[in-house]
């Protein structure tokens, strides 16, 4: 009847022929749940383009994390046995010299002991200034030596045996050392950073003067014998233990072991208790109480010097004089044990 009319009129084109696009769900029904990742006809091209900038950091691609190499572990510093034995011998000689020097002190005869203390103070100034290298090194060394002389004279000549003259000497020495560093324009920038080192040098020098003051009070000479013997034994045993068994290592950069610190403090305390049973005015208990403080402060000060030296080397500072660096620890230990002995004698004896 209508030859120009197609037979497909009135039929839906999608009823017989599937669509070229992806098939979807039937009309009126919810989509079926997905059971797996959708398959793509082609692989996603590798992203090659400029790196995206991250906030607060450099740009990177997501696959950069796999390209990062793991950080290499820093090998621990080896423990040199001959060096540990040498430092142990120096600590023993220093302790014997201070203890025997205290026996030469008597009423009206303080100068021999003060001369021995001044020699130790000069060693302290040499070792610590060469190891720490503050600005205007020569000025700091000369001022510290002059401060040592003033402190020793004040300790011997003062009417009342006390620490006030030594405190005034330390304050004056620190002020002169800082002013000497400020005079030179080159050293002004480093004055603030090196103030702590200058303070340690000046105060450490004056700390040895407390032994002269301690020798002037009752039971002072006996207290010096007990405390410095405990400190010397603790330093000696700690270094000998490090030469034999430096375990466990406290830090990879510090060639010291925890066993030496603990065993040294224990044997130093035991030695002081044995001395207390023979010295007049002491008992084993009181001597052990005084000795444990001196031994612990000495070995901890020695250990702190090792950490400070490792920190300077890690910061890139060139190593200083070999002898000065290794004399620094025992000298610092006895410098801290001296005021500790004075405090324990005044407070508990």
Description of each model-found segment:
Residues 135-146, 165-168, 189-201, 251-263, ...:
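Cytoplasmic-side transmembrane-helix entry/capping segments in multi-pass membrane proteins
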Residues 100-120, 159-175, 217-234, 284-299:
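Structural signature of hydrophobic alpha-helical transmembrane segments
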Residues 72, 121-135, 176-191, 236-252, ...:
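C-terminal ends of transmembrane helices
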Residues 68, 116-127, 147-151, 172-179:
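Central hydrophobic cores of alpha-helical transmembrane segments in multi-pass inner-membrane proteins
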Residues 1-123, 129:
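N-terminal signal-anchor module of multipass membrane proteins
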Residues 190-273, 277, 281:
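Internal active-site segments that recognize and position negatively charged phosphoryl groups
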Residues 152-167, 179-190, 209-220:
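Transmembrane alpha-helix boundary signature
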Residues 3-12, 17, 27-29, 79-80, ...:
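C-terminal transmembrane helix-loop-helix hairpin of multi-pass membrane proteins
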């Amino acid at each position: 009847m209508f030859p120009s009319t197609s037979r497909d009129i009135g039929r839906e084109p999608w009823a017989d022929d599937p669509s070229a696009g992806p098939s979807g769900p039937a009309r009126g029904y919810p989509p079926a749940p997905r059971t797996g990742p959708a398959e793509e006809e082609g692989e996603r091209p590798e992203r090659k383009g400029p790196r995206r900038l991250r906030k607060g950091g450099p740009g990177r691609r997501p696959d950069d994390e796999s390209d990062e190499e793991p950080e290499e572990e820093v090998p621990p510093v080896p423990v040199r046995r001959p060096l540990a034995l040498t430092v142990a011998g120096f600590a023993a000689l220093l302790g014997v010299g201070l203890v025997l020097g205290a026996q030469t002190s008597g009423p009206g005869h303080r100068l021999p002991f003060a001369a021995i203390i001044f020699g130790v103070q000069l060693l302290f100034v040499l070792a610590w200034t060469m190891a720490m290298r503050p600005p205007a090194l020569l000025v700091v060394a000369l001022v510290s030596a002059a401060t040592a002389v003033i402190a020793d004279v004040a300790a011997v000549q003062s009417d009342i045996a006390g620490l006030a003259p030594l405190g005034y000497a330390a304050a004056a020495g620190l002020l002169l050392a800082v002013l000497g560093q400020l005079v030179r324009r080159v050293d002004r920038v480093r004055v603030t950073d090196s103030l702590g080192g200058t303070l340690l040098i000046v105060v450490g020098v004056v700390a040895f003067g407390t032994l002269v003051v301690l020798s002037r009070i009752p039971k002072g000479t006996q207290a010096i014998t007990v405390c410095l013997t405990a400190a010397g034994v603790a330093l000696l045993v700690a270094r000998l233990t490090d030469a034999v068994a430096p375990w466990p290592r406290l830090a990879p950069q510090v060639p010291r072991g925890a066993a030496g610190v603990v065993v040294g403090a224990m044997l130093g305390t035991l030695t002081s208790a044995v001395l207390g049973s023979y010295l007049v005015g002491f008992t084993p208990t009181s001597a052990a109480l005084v000795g444990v403080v001196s031994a612990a402060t000495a070995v901890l000060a020695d250990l702190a010097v090792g950490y400070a030296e490792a920190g300077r080397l890690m910061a890139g500072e060139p190593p200083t004089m070999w002898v000065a660096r290794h004399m620094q620890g025992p000298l610092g230990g006895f410098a801290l044990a001296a005021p500790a002995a004075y405090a324990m004698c005044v407070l508990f004896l």
